[in-house]
Amino acid sequence: YIFNDFMLTKEGAATLDEIAVRVYATVVSTPSKEYAVLDGGTKTFYMDIVPETPPYYYPGYAVVAGNDDLQLLRMNEEHGILTSKKGDTGLHVGDIVELIPIHVCTTINQQNEVYLYDGETLRKEKVAARGMLV
């Protein structure tokens, strides 16, 4: 796999540091301190896994980088709901959240473009096989 993903960490084939893909979502609403609404839902994070079930007990549809307390357990097409194990997410409207996809193949397949960073330069590329089966 060229990107690695969280699934591969459960298999022992990759570490979090070896996952090359990040999705950045913006907090668009915080109706309660217990949850925050992101501008990334099922059109961004695929639902081909069931969080918190055997055999791997994935912590959600994506992992919040650097924050094991936050979980992405609910989504609709356009929005994801981040909750906190501790009760208060600490997030505010406008905050940018860095997420690691559980399954990168389906995440990339749903995007029109990706941004590539080589340590110096950031460039935008079209996803050539976007929406394709192969």
What do the PLM-derived regions correspond to, one by one?
Residues 1-134:
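Active-site anion/phosphate-binding pocket segments in diverse small-molecule metabolic enzymes
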